[in-house]
């Protein structure tokens, strides 16, 4: 009996014991500290069975003067580049001969200090847009509109807000999970005090990473929120004959221009001059755990990018097909969100804008997987097929709104 009790006590201790980790604070607005150029490696941490590094670089020149990037490099896995200066956005992810990301005419990591989001009638956001993943929100998102005595600029402000607190954490034991956290504040006197603790989680050697973001309303009053995880992919995944796959209840064109592409929503053209962009609104299906997956896969079916998300947190999905010329920006977007990309005025009317009470928090969990073998692609195709089941996809020809 004594041995059994001791064994149970030991097991309880193991279950309740916190995971030990080393933490570095790279930036803190509260304590006015910034480590600037900084690096830690698996060798420095005396990790023997993994080869990885985490580095922060301060950039110089042009409109990226003073911008910071953090680069996670795993020799047998992914290289993930994100920017604390730009709302902890992900610039690109590379590994196994595949890239998640795209080639924008914007080549620099533009410092928000040089941005004017209200320029070009609310389209200033485009002057810095080159990321693999941008958080479009959280106070509002979508196309610009003037209402309520203000300009709601394109896709909100979070993606152009430098993080106030940036931390890197590495677990002390296998599998040595890396976490990069950044606190993004949208705080305006009399308007809002929304704060998002963003977190990227990556296990060295893996072909996937996760985002775990917690949005909190720090004000004494309720406040609306919206978010679109604008996730963008170009070559080598995107090409003529590439395909988009996702389980869905319905799909409809965003506007009249996209009507012409409705029957070909699943297929991508090569770079096409004058194509501009077509956008489609999707109502996704999910499994019994409310999880769903959307993916873009190349023509051969041996490369791709998949995003898993929770439809309780992110109930709608936008497909953005921008298969214009390569210099203009040959890219597609898979965009889980609380809203579609219509202006906030339309999203309010159609009751997709959500609200947080004073002091309330909500969270968003997404997993991104870089697919680099036909077997991995087949697994995702099978998973999506199982969620779709026998449910027919309804192709709705009329846009649900008109700007």
Predicted regions, residues:
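Surface-exposed acidic/polar loop and edge beta-strand patches at domain peripheries
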Residues: 22-210, 222-224, 233-271, 283-403
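N-terminal signal peptide c-region/cleavage motif recognized by signal peptidases
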Residues: 16-18
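Sec-dependent N-terminal signal peptides
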Residues: 5-14
């Amino acid at each position: 009996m004594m041995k059994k009790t001791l064994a149970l006590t030991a097991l309880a201790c193991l279950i309740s014991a916190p995971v030990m980790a080393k933490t570095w604070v790279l930036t803190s607005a509260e304590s006015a500290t910034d480590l600037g150029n900084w690096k830690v490696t698996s060798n420095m941490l005396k990790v023997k069975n993994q080869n990885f590094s985490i580095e922060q670089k301060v950039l110089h020149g042009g409109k990226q003067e003073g911008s910071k990037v953090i680069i996670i490099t795993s020799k047998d896995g992914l290289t993930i580049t994100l920017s604390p200066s730009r709302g902890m956005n992900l610039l690109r992810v590379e590994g196994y001969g595949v890239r998640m990301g795209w080639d924008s005419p914007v080549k620099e990591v533009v410092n928000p200090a040089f941005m004017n989001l209200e320029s070009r009638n609310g389209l200033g956001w485009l002057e810095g847009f080159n990321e693999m993943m941008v958080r479009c929100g959280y106070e509002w998102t979508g196309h610009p509109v003037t209402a309520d005595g203000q300009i709601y600029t394109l896709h909100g402000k979070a993606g152009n807000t430098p993080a106030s607190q940036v931390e890197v954490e590495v677990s002390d034991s296998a599998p040595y999970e890396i976490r990069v956290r950044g606190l993004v504040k949208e705080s305006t006197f009399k308007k809002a005090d929304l704060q998002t603790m963003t977190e990227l989680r990556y296990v060295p050697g893996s072909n996937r990473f996760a985002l775990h973001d917690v949005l909190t309303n720090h004000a004494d009053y309720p406040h609306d929120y919206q978010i679109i995880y604008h996730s963008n992919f170009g070559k080598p995944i995107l090409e003529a004959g590439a395909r988009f796959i996702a389980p869905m209840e319905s799909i409809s064109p965003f506007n009249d221009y996209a009507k012409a592409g409705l029957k070909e929503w699943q297929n991508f053209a090569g770079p096409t001059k004058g194509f501009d962009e077509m956008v489609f609104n999707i109502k996704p299906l999910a499994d019994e755990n409310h999880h769903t997956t959307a993916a873009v896969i190349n023509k051969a079916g041996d490369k791709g990018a998949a995003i898993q998300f929770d439809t309780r947190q992110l109930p709608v999905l936008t497909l953005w097909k921008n298969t214009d010329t390569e210099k203009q920006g040959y890219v597609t977007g898979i965009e889980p969100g609380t809203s579609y990309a219509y202006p906030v005025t339309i999203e309010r009317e159609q009751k997709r804008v959500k609200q947080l009470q004073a002091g309330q928090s909500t969270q968003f969990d997404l997993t991104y997987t870089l697919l680099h073998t036909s077997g991995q692609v087949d697994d995702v195709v099978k998973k999506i097929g199982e969620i779709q089941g026998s449910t027919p996809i309804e192709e709705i020809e009329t846009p649900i709104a008109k700007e």
